[in-house]
């Protein structure tokens, strides 16, 4: 006889097995994080384009409008983010009001939306920088070492989801490009169309 008690535990991360969108999975991860750390009001991702040096706001999990929707900037024009890469370590700002340089647009936008603390984790794929993960809170001084130790696990898990998504897109683009090369030999017009689509 099967004992139902053996199956009583619910896997809090079972959403990772779903085939939903990356945003849906990040929102689900945010819900799991908030069960433990209610003060995490927003998780956001920026992606880095190595060819252009541009960071682009990609997605966020917050309930309100994204303060950085459609925002992009050269990494070279974001010295505090560039410093994260130089040091190879995440950045913790426990009180955004204390930031001396409020001249950057992204800092002003985050502040206007009521975020008081920020944790920024760089994301890598096999050693290559791919973007940043931001965890924001409306409360100051919440990112203690104990909290950060646990948030690192969630942060790296989300980074792996992003890496997986990027790999799938690159694979699809490579397949379309290969198909275009084959099609060029048989039908140049269709091959040119596939080149434009990839």
Spans of model-derived segments:
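Signal-transmission/dimerization alpha-helices at domain junctions
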Residues: 1-2, 15, 87-90, 126, ...
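Signal-transmission linkers at sensory-effector interfaces
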Residues: 1-27, 35, 164-178
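Helix-loop-beta substructure at the N-terminus of cytosolic sensory domains
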Residues: 15-58, 66-69, 191, 198
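Flexible loop/coil segments at beta-strand boundaries within sensory signal-transduction domains
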Residues: 51-52, 124-129, 138
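Regulatory sensory and allosteric helical modules in signal-transduction proteins
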Residues: 65-101, 105, 109-111
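A short, aliphatic-rich beta-strand micro-motif
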Residues: 116-124
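Regulatory loop-to-helix N-cap segments in sensory/regulatory domains
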Residues: 130, 136-152, 162-165
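… and, occasionally, acidic/histidine-rich disordered N-termini of signaling adaptors
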Residues: 169-198
């Amino acid at each position: 006889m099967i004992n139902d008690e053996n199956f009583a535990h619910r896997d809090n991360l079972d959403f990772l097995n779903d085939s939903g969108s990356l945003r849906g999975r990040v929102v689900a991860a945010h819900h799991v994080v908030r069960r433990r750390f209610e003060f995490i009001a927003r998780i956001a991702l920026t992606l880095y384009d190595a060819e252009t040096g541009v960071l682009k706001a990609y997605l966020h999990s917050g309930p309100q409008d994204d303060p950085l929707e459609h925002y992009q900037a050269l990494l070279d024009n974001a010295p505090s983010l560039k410093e994260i890469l130089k040091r190879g370590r995440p950045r913790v700002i426990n009180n955004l009001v204390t930031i001396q340089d409020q001249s950057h647009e992204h800092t002003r936008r985050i502040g206007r939306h009521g975020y008081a603390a920020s944790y920024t984790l760089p994301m890598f794929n096999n050693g290559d920088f791919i973007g940043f993960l931001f965890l924001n809170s409306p409360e100051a001084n919440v990112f203690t070492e104990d909290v950060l130790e646990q948030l690192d696990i969630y942060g790296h898990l989300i980074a792996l989801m992003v890496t997986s998504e990027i790999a799938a897109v690159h694979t699809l683009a490579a397949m379309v490009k290969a198909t275009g090369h084959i099609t060029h030999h048989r039908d140049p017009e269709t091959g040119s169309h596939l080149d434009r689509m990839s």
